[in-house]
Amino acid sequence: MTDDEGGNVDDSAPGEGWSGLAAWAGVELLRPLPGGHRNVVMLAERAGVPLVVRRSIRSRAALDWELDLLEHLRDRGVAAPELVPTDDGRRHVDGMLVSEFVPGRHPAGPADWRRVVDQLAVLHTATTGWPQRPGFAASGMLLDAGRGGDVRLDAMPASVARLVRSAWLPVQQGPRCVVHGDVGPTNVLVDGARVTLLDWDEARVDVPWFDYALLPDEVTTPWPGDRAQLRAAGLAWETATCWRAEPVYARRRLAELHRHRRHSGA
């Protein structure tokens, strides 16, 4: 997720598991980039031009869904890193992708976050009715189902699964659309008026409110209900989606959810 302390980072050396990079002639790996808790992300260059190389753990169908989505969004004005195809025109090779390096800084205050909210609204409007990502499930489906995407409610203690589902219930109203799924400072770059959303690995179809759940409290969002309930839903989602993949982070988020509910009554 977006917490720099969470998750398991693959510290593979640049020479290990990168043979597929030969499909992009002249691309040289430089160093790991921050984040990459579930996927390895490297800074690279070709002929002096900076690039980003990522290895995705998603299935081919789930990765193709992500890349189709990003093409659709760029056509509608949502800034996202531009994919660099292989020399023979493929979008990825066994989960390895190359994209342009996006300049910018992370959001620094309410004005930046308001621009992020505006960009998210464009994303949600542009994807109403979009098909669900293969293998994933929306929070509404997971009120009954045990798993979907990275969520493994069936692997949690029953009391934790009940807590998570109860936190999701108040946010189920509204349209279904694509949500980025991991909106936080490290996944947003601001460059003047341009706001770029990075790392769409956790994108899915759900109610739009999850993308606003963990934004700073002082930032106004389109969510029409109680802000404490929205934050509880976001903390519950992070607990559920990280339970298996990032267990230390998930349990930290669970503790935060308990504290939040005690203090707010949400």
Report residues per predicted region.
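Juxta-kinase regulatory segment immediately upstream of eukaryotic protein kinase catalytic domains
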Residues: 1-29
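ATP-binding glycine-rich phosphate-binding loop
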Residues: 24-45
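A conserved alpha-helical element in kinase catalytic cores
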Residues: 54-94, 107-123
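A glycine-centered beta->alpha junction motif in the catalytic cores
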Residues: 95-109, 147-150, 236-251
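A cross-family kinase active-site recognition segment
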Residues: 106-158, 176
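Active-site Asp-x-Gly
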Residues: 178, 190-231
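Catalytic-loop of the protein kinase fold
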Residues: 178-180, 185
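Helix-rich C-terminal or lid/interface subdomains of diverse kinases
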Residues: 213, 217, 221-266
